[in-house]
Design a protein with these regions (language model features):
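Short, solvent-exposed turn/loop segments enriched in Gly/Ser/Thr/Pro and often Arg
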Residues: 61-66, 149, 185-194, 214, ...
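Glycine-rich phosphate-binding "P-loop"
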Residues: 147-170
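Conserved short loop/turn motifs at secondary-structure junctions
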Residues: 183-193, 355-359, 494
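Acidic (Asp/Glu)-rich catalytic clusters
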Residues: 2, 47-55, 129-146, 165, ...
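Active-site and substrate-binding clefts of carbohydrate-active enzymes
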Residues: 2-57, 62-106, 221-448, 464-546
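Hydrophobic, small-residue-rich alpha-helical packing segments that form membrane-like cores
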Residues: 192, 197-206
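CE4/NodB-like, metal-dependent polysaccharide N-deacetylase domain
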Residues: 164-188, 331-344, 348-351
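Intrinsically disordered, low-complexity repeat regions of secreted/extracellular protein precursors
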Residues: 448-463
Length: 546
């Protein structure tokens, strides 16, 4: 038996952004950047470790909107063009920097090599479908993939029982479609919990969820082992809470590893640094400058201005990632030894949940850190064993019964990020749509029917117009409920886009509802909305009935 258990949990999520009405769209780059910098590197690392005999073990949420985007042919095609454009620029850069700067030339060569490797993985190994790659990793025992709320809806701010239930049940149905099994666990959007949510999870046959630290620490009764063992609610749903120490070592802007001077600087990008005419062929048709992903500078120092940043040296950054991984493991061993003294002879569990996008997008060397971490865990020590929450539940260790408290992992630990003076205007519209959705479901659902996972092969054109409208009403409500819009408005980033997205889904909901009320179907408009917001082909509106 090890001294301690460690559970790395990655949360891979992006809001559903797909704009077939335009030939290209800036916010679709969120997905494309994440594929290049996060998902492809992590999948490749996990598979390489497994094939080399150093099998990693971790949990990962691949959210339903992300699954739907990764499996979408339009977005797959657009990503391929995005990557080919980036490779073309990188090749130009390799030629340009050869004469101008040896330091920058080494970085340009690195980009050419890594991007060409990414294109090969994308086209040839993974056949442009990363959902299948994640599924294979789960089938091979590397990942325990968990689900998330259907569109990352913030459950405590959803007004009706039926709309909350739908966020869970639709997520489960979508998970089954993509991964061919039932999810054991769920990452509640923003780790947002309030008492009663566990009843919805139990109904959906979900065994556990992830919470923030204070959900357990302030629960009733006081947790005997703090956050270093799960608790279980009265109805049997387990709760795994975030460990503070590991969170700070990676997340903290002051002491976290990603802030090291040798790591790549995120904000210096060729899209802004290079001559405009030089990069213009690689910009969108609007010609507006944007991040392109090729960055040549290192952090250098926290207080060093952007124009004083020094050249990025990949070899030094890689060595630092290895050093940080060793330090992280050493700290986990010390932590486990200290905790074990009060744990009645069984190993403590350290749960470390992070946004997956930290590893590769915000922290370029993050995938290297994970690679070194699992190699060193396997080859260099025996005190720490990496497991998933499901593995812990399967161990049969006794778990304390507790009622967790309301919480989220947002600023200050509760709900203010998602409801405040900047975004509170959204909720009357959302809550009205939630109420009306249940009214429509009650009116049109077959009496006595129960929600079943529908066949994903069911063609839209074979459904009755009323059924198509009702299912699209559900999609528009779900997309409006995405917590990403309120979060980005609070953060002050992409405020216009987030506001417009929320408003457009409410507007489409109202237009569709008016069709239903009048009994006059605008076939052309309905087809246009279905083609634009095509998430969850398998959806069944009757889940909203009470």
């Amino acid at each position: 038996m090890p001294t301690g258990y460690f559970s790395l949990i990655l949360h891979a999520h992006l809001p559903f952004v797909r704009h077939p009405e335009y030939p290209e769209f800036l916010e679709e780059d969120w997905l494309f950047e994440a594929i290049t910098e996060v998902y492809l590197p992590l999948i490749f690392i996990f598979q390489s470790l497994h094939e080399a005999g150093a099998k990693p073990r971790l949990a990962m949420n691949v959210s339903p909107p992300l699954c739907e985007m990764l499996a979408d042919e339009l977005l797959q095609t657009r990503y391929t063009s995005h990557l080919e454009n980036l490779i073309e620029l990188a090749v130009k850069e390799e030629f340009r920097t050869r004469a101008e700067s040896n330091a920058f030339h080494d970085v340009a060569k690195m980009y050419v090599e890594s991007l060409l490797a990414s294109l090969d993985l994308w086209n040839n190994r993974y056949k442009r479908n990363l959902v299948n790659a994640f599924r294979e990793l789960q089938d091979e025992g590397v990942l325990e993939i968990i689900t998330c709320c259907a569109t990352h809806g913030f459950l405590p701010l959803i007004s009706t029982h039926e709309a909350r239930r739908a966020q869970i049940q639709i997520a489960v149905a979508n998970y089954k479609k993509h991964f061919g099994r039932h999810p054991r666990g769920i990452w509640l959007a923003e780790c947002a919990y309030e008492p009663g949510v566990e009843k919805l999870l139990k109904e959906a046959e979900i065994e556990y969820f992830i919470s923030d630290t204070h959900s357990i620490l302030y629960g009733d009764p006081r947790p005997r082992y703090g956050v270093h063992a799960p608790v279980v609610t009265q109805n049997g749903v387990a709760v795994f809470a975030r460990d503070v120490e590991t969170s700070q070592q990676v997340w903290s802007a002051e002491i976290g590893y990603p802030g090291n001077d040798l790591y790549r600087e995120f904000y210096r990008d060729i899209g802004w640094d290079a001559d405009y005419e030089y990069v213009k062929p690689h910009l969108h048709a609007s010609g507006e400058r944007r991040h392109l992903g090729l960055k040549y500078h290192r952090i250098t120092g926290r207080d060093v201005p952007q124009n004083r940043k020094e050249p990025y040296i990949p070899a030094l950054a890689r060595d630092k990632a290895a050093e940080n991984a060793s330090h992280f493991i050493g700290e986990r061993i010390k932590q486990a030894i200290e905790l074990r003294e009060t744990f009645d002879g069984h190993p403590p569990l350290v749960v470390s949940p992070y946004d997956a996008e930290l590893y590769g997008h915000w922290w370029y060397e993050g995938p290297q850190f994970i690679d070194f971490f699992f190699k060193k865990i396997h080859f260099d020590q025996r005190e720490i064993e990496c497991i998933t929450p499901g593995d812990f539940l399967d161990s049969g260790l006794p778990i304390q019964v507790q009622q967790p408290t309301a919480s989220s992992w947002g600023e200050s630990g509760y709900f203010k990020v998602w409801i405040n003076e900047n975004n509170s205007w959204m909720y009357p519209y959302q809550h009205d749509a939630e109420r009306r959705m249940t009214e429509y479901a009650n009116k049109f659902a077959v009496p006595g029917s129960e929600f079943q996972v529908p066949s994903s092969q069911l063609e839209t054109r074979n459904q009755k117009p009323e059924t198509r409208i009702l299912n699209q009403l559900a999609r528009e409500l779900l997309l409006a409920q995405s917590s990403d819009w309120a979060f980005q408005i609070y953060q002050g980033t992409t405020v216009q886009y987030s506001s417009r997205r929320f408003q457009s889904h409410i507007q489409r909901f109202n237009m569709l509802a008016e069709m239903l009320d009048r009994g006059n179907v605008d076939e052309e408009l309905l087809a246009e909305i279905e083609a634009r917001d095509n998430i969850f082909a398998e959806i069944d509106f009757s889940i909203y009935a009470n």
